[in-house]
């Protein structure tokens, strides 16, 4: 598969407490030519990984599950965006109710994606990254 130039330089940090979902997302991104910069199983680990991957712009996108132990994806996003307002975040959740979507928009999260759309993630990442460059 031929990737777009913006996808080739994009990197992803996948944050999800479900190991199978992290694996699926990794396969989907790698098959599309998008590099996975790392994985995290919860919010605190995601924040640590971002510090390890510093300086920005690595990763280009943080893919965040919303329902995780310790911190929700929205809580993690708020922490990330307070330190890195330019960070592109995609909220990826099985449960996207209107309140979650409204809070995501308020925080500046780039997109909210249902887990049922996992195979569409590369196209969504390309679109979001292209809109920010």
Residue ranges and their predicted role:
Residues 1-11, 119-133:
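Non-catalytic signal-transmission and effector/linker regions of two-component phosphorelay proteins
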Residues 19-38:
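Two-component/phosphorelay signaling modules centered on CheY-like receiver
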Residues 39-61:
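Acidic, metal-coordinating helix/loop segments flanking the phosphotransfer/catalytic sites
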Residues 42-45, 72-76:
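Acidic catalytic/metal-coordinating carboxylates
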Residues 64-65:
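Active-site residues of response regulator receiver
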Residues 68:
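Receiver (REC) domain active-site loop signature in two-component systems and cognate sites
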Residues 74-85:
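Short amphipathic alpha-helix used as the core "switch/output" element in two-component signaling
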